[in-house]
Amino acid sequence: MIRGFIGVQIAPEVRSRISQAVAQLAPEISGIRWVREDNFHFTLKFLGVIEEPQIEPISNALAQAIRPFRRFTINAKGLGVFPDVKRARVLWVGLEGIDMPALAKSVETVLEPFGFPRENTIFRPHLTIGRWRHLSGSHQELGGKLKRRNDTEFGESAVDEVVLFQSVLKPGGAVYRPLKTVRLADDRMTS
């Protein structure tokens, strides 16, 4: 059994800029578990546990989902939290890109017949950089720190492929391993 998700990798230079911001934030924000730079990605759809024989059919469905899309650019900008500042659990970098909501919807549509239910939440493109177990410190203080960085630009990243990842849980944190990659430009799959 494999823990899987569908995601998009972020350009190395954007990951590096975000990592630099994390290094500046780390002393200011306590009680958070930071995501490692090599794990920065944008999740289109979390799958959970899948069986190995499902990998190929899921990859084929993914190719169908992205067929109408061509390479596009996303912009990483600003910081925010889910669900809100008073109950912060996830610290994220915002992602802007005109085709992202349509791409996520297309992926959800083709994966629904495999038993992966549609999300009941509003789609908010983001890149998780940290998670809290319990928020410590003032909510107003956290809100102020986020507001000061709301316009921080981390750069643009091309979206030219979508990846089926395996998430391997290890004592030091999750490790993400690409299982299948589908390119937006020509729908070819690679292992």
Regions found by a protein language model. Name each.
Residues M1-S191:
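Histidine-dependent nucleotide/RNA phosphoesterase domain, centered on the 2H-phosphoesterase fold
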